[in-house]
């Protein structure tokens, strides 16, 4: 996160256990489509803004080395405790590094990450980390990713996108305008899968439903593709 206010709100949500965004199971699109990447066992997968996602357990079980980054020490602590793992801990620059088996989590601010902190990265797994950020920060998030991750690493990007007003179904099921605006200059964008759902327009009960699109993108750097 880039502002102290955003950081404070995120840390406060974990202190207050306001974490409805945390999923209690592995993302079904991950389990369904990951094998199509043909990524070699032992490859290193970066999971930005990882929270305490169970997807990291799944990835490690498939034989991958997982490197997460998470601002909240409560989230990191809970991840290891709830999965009955006893991590080793040490300082790494501005971060606290927690490690157990194939899973490493850097506890600290994503925007403080340097390439040397991550080491070699073969794939990025973004499970709605991008879309969880405030809109004015997303471009900074993408730009920083390009600095700390090598061009050779593809991005497995999961998003939840609201259908825009006056948008046709064919437009809604295509590459989102924001995704195109953020990535098209430097990446080839492959929209691999789309699922539509109707969800409450707000957290207030008895609200109208709105259509949202759950999308899976595979992003490949143009510098590698060429």
Regions found by a protein language model. Give the residues of each.
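Class I (Rossmann-like) S-adenosyl-L-methionine-dependent methyltransferase catalytic domain
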Residues: 2-41, 52-55, 68-103, 107-117, ...
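Class I SAM-dependent methyltransferase "Motif I" SAM/SAH-binding loop
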Residues: 46-51, 129
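Short beta->alpha connector loops
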Residues: 50-52, 135-136
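Gly/Ala-rich phosphate-binding loop of Rossmann-like dinucleotide-binding domains
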Residues: 60-61
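Conserved acetyl-CoA-binding loop of GNAT-fold acetyltransferases
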Residues: 64
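A short SAM/SAH-binding and catalytic strip from SAM-dependent methyltransferases
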Residues: 110-113, 121-137
């Amino acid at each position: 996160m880039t502002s102290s206010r955003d950081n404070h709100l995120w840390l406060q949500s974990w202190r207050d256990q306001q974490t409805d965004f945390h999923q209690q199971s592995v993302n079904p699109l991950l389990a369904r489509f990951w094998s199509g990447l043909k990524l070699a066992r032992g490859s290193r997968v970066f999971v930005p803004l990882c929270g305490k996602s169970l997807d990291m357990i799944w990835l490690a079980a498939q034989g991958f080395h997982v490197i997460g980054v998470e601002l909240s020490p409560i989230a990191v602590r809970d991840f290891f405790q709830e999965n009955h793992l006893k991590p080793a801990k040490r300082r790494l620059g501005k971060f606290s590094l927690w490690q157990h088996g194939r899973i490493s989590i850097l506890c600290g601010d994503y925007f403080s990450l340097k390439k040397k902190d991550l080491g070699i990265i073969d794939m990025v797994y973004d499970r709605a980390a991008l879309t969880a950020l405030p809109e004015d920060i997303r471009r900074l998030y993408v730009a920083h990713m390009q600095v700390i991750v090598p061009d050779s690493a593809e991005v497995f990007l999961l998003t939840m996108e609201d259908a825009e007003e006056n948008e046709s179904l064919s437009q809604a099921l295509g590459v989102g305008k924001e995704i195109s605006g953020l990535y098209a200059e430097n990446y080839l964008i492959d929209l691999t899968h789309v699922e539509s759902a109707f969800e409450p327009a707000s957290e207030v009960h008895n609200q109208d439903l709105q259509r949202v699109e759950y999308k899976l993108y595979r992003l490949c750097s143009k510098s590698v593709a060429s």
